[in-house]
From Swiss-Prot:
Family affiliation: Belongs to the stanniocalcin family.
Any one Gene Ontology molecular-function term assigned to this protein's record: hormone activity
Compartment(s): Secreted
GO CC, alphabetical: extracellular space; multivesicular body; nucleus; yolk plasma
Subunit structure: Homodimer; disulfide-linked.
Protein name per Swiss-Prot or TrEMBL: Stanniocalcin
Pfam families linked to this entry: Stanniocalcin
Propeptide, residue positions: 19-33
Keywords: Calcium, Calcium transport, Disulfide bond, Glycoprotein, Hormone, Ion transport, Secreted, Signal, Transport
Biological processes annotated in GO: calcium ion homeostasis; calcium ion transport; intracellular calcium ion homeostasis; response to calcium ion; response to peptide hormone
Positions of glycan attachment: N62
Length: 256
């Protein structure tokens, strides 16, 4: 999906949490400190969950497989559903049902390996968004989709990244809508980021690393930033850039 844009730097920022696969066996001791639901617990929960509402996605929370995130996205869609038009309301209901049914139907095939299970959820999510025309919904509901795409609270989330990537794979008009919404919330820093992402293409066979920058670009601090990869929402450094949860009002005050 990202090939359409040639977004080299997306692995530096947008994709760090979404595309970084930690080895399940290596990561399990660290996760055990804040996770309680084993894969079998998750499977049993999904098997008994209703396909409406956010119950299915609640089963994915607090899992040793680090599958948090879809429940927050589900709640965001439900909380903003009233601001969508008729097409948007249908999309909210059907996309959440589609993802819930897809995940539940494939859970027993993938639950044994955390990496496979995580990817399956993302693939189902992406397929449902595409099938139900998320691009058309975003074009006709720019304000509502902007409320859903709240970057500061959801950056370290692989399923938020799948949502954002699905929107960025749309036509230029829709991408412009999403971009404008993000820039309005995050200010000039996000504008600079988008310029880097959309102007720098990744040539095939390139040996450039994720910290490479376009010709002529100078990093503000003299060297590329180093981002700490934190796969889970829990146990994060509260002072970390992507861990800060700031409201829209706080952002607006900072931008004044």
């Amino acid at each position: 999906m990202l090939a359409k844009f040639g977004l080299c730097a997306v692995f530096l920022v947008l994709g760090t949490a979404a595309t970084f696969d930690t080895d399940p066996e290596e990561a399990s001791p660290r996760r055990a400190r804040f996770s309680s639901n084993s894969p079998s617990d998750v499977a049993r929960c999904l098997n008994g969950a209703l396909a409406v509402g956010c119950g299915t996605f609640a089963c994915l929370e607090n899992s040793t497989c680090d599958t948090d995130g879809m429940h927050d996205i589900c709640q965001l869609f439900f909380h903003t559903a009233a601001t969508f038009n008729t097409q948007g309301k249908t999309f909210v209901k059907e996309s959440l049902r589609c993802i819930a049914n897809g995940v539940t139907s494939k859970v027993f095939q993938t639950i044994r390996r955390c990496g496979v299970f995580q990817r399956m959820i993302s693939e189902v999510q992406e397929e449902c968004y595409s099938r139900l025309d998320i691009c058309g919904v975003a074009r006709s509901n720019p304000e509502a989709i902007g409320e859903v795409v709240q970057v500061p609270a959801h950056f370290p989330n692989r399923y938020y990244s799948t949502l954002l990537q699905s929107l960025l794979a749309c036509d230029e008009e829709t991408v412009a809508v999403v971009r404008a919404g993000l820039v309005a919330r995050l200010g000039p820093d996000m504008e600079t980021l988008f310029q880097l992402l959309q102007n720098k293409h990744c040539p095939q066979g390139s040996n450039q690393g994720p910290n490479s920058a376009p010709a002529g670009w100078r990093w503000p601090m003299g060297s590329p930033p180093s981002f700490k990869i934190q796969p889970s929402m829990r146990g994060r450094d509260p002072t970390h850039l992507f861990a800060r949860k700031r409201s829209v009002e706080a952002l607006e005050r900072e931008m004044e």
